[in-house]
């Protein structure tokens, strides 16, 4: 249902019915207002751009055009860290929408008023679809449990549901952010649940498709270059021959293994903490709530989510995210190697290795006319470096779960999602703007191969290692060819050299 929703939609205009309409709404009147609230506490300030809302610490001004409430405003006041670029990642917010919808549906099964439940579900759907993104201003750098973001979601869904039912924003009547939207939930189990939902969706919609695209393009190049024999390099020095296709096949296998590692980490990501509430005991939930919520989330996303078998682990440790981040870190190592190889093999065009001709995408220098650079390789290697750094942060966060709760949750999921998005997007960019357009410079490849001293390795079985080494060293010292030197030293004839030193016969075991 939600898997294809990626574009941000504009928030709906706020249309509010008079508060009096609430009292006349069948089945919705009579909800109590907390005794510490002044009369008409949530009434709009008619001459101002804000309304007054209350939390347990007192009153706060809330912008009239926002669905969030007092706790969200208080968080924006207390955590002015980083600005808009550090806001909670959109995938987390959308994941919360999915979770809150699932919870409302299950709570209805356990007796929640259907009118309230349906309004919550409709509002939660809008959150999941990205229609209310402008109402989530909180940054990652807040409480380590993500409580403020959970309440931000609760307030937005509550007020949007209230609006749908003709009520007054901020009144918490008939839909209360805690009693109804957060029913049978705690921030301690909802935030890790949203983390796993967001990570799983990002992996399936962005990361794995990007890697698959790169894998297929590299595989096509490996087949295209299957007959091109080139000199190999070890320690960055000349080695024995292989085909360019064989070289690329190594890259293909690296990306294949990357996808395998990521998929292998996913079963733990599919385990959801929902139902554990505050410390993992499931206090204030009903028997079966956790299983039903996981099943609803699975149905909504099309992914095989299940309830976590041990909620204490699910709240206090986030080893599953560390594991996934580790798989992405290994992927970054692979992509760093692949991108570096390709840019070095394409170095030049006249003074480098020059074995590959890379696509020319844009001017490369503001001072050197005609210069073109391997920018896609550079972007990929920067992405790889960033992912490696992200993994360090995730590792530190994952190792700091204390007693019954890990309080590095927002930072961890920010970095996991960042890595997944960067690797997926970079793989697509690298594929479309570099890999598919790579050409082999066969003239240069042949020249370098025929000049290589390491072809002498083919003589080992015939004249022995020591004599072969002397041929190579003498040829290098004198600037002569292997063939000329071998004949001059009297180790073999021209005919023997031509018979034994054939690059095409040096590509595999005999």
Swiss-Prot record:
Optimum pH is 7.5-8.0. HAMAP family: FumaraseC. Homotetramer. Interacts with H2AZ1. Coiled coil: none annotated. One of its GO terms (biological process) is arginine metabolic process. SUPFAM superfamilies: L-aspartase-like. Catalyzes the reversible stereospecific interconversion of fumarate to L-malate. Experiments in other species have demonstrated that specific isoforms of this protein act in defined pathways and favor one direction over the other. Its EC number is 4.2.1.2. It is linked to Fumarase deficiency: A severe autosomal recessive metabolic disorder characterized by early-onset hypotonia, profound psychomotor retardation, and brain abnormalities, such as agenesis of the corpus callosum, gyral defects, and ventriculomegaly. Many patients show neonatal distress, metabolic acidosis, and/or encephalopathy. Pfam families: FumaraseC_C, Lyase_1. PROSITE patterns: FUMARATE_LYASES. Changing residue 147 to A: Does not affect phosphorylation by PRKDC. It is an enzyme of class 4 (lyase). The modification Phosphothreonine is found at residues 85, 90, 236. The modification Phosphoserine is found at residue 366. The record marks 378 as: Important for catalytic activity. The active site is at residues 235, 365. The keyword Nuclease does not apply. This is Fumarate hydratase, mitochondrial. It comes from the Eukaryota. GO terms for molecular function: fumarate hydratase activity; histone binding. Belongs to the class-II fumarase/aspartase family. Fumarase subfamily. It catalyses: (S)-malate = fumarate + H2O. GO terms for cellular component: chromosome; cytoplasm; cytosol; extracellular exosome; mitochondrial matrix; mitochondrion; nucleus; site of double-strand break. Substrate binds at residues 145-147, 176-179, 186-188, 234, 366, 371-373.
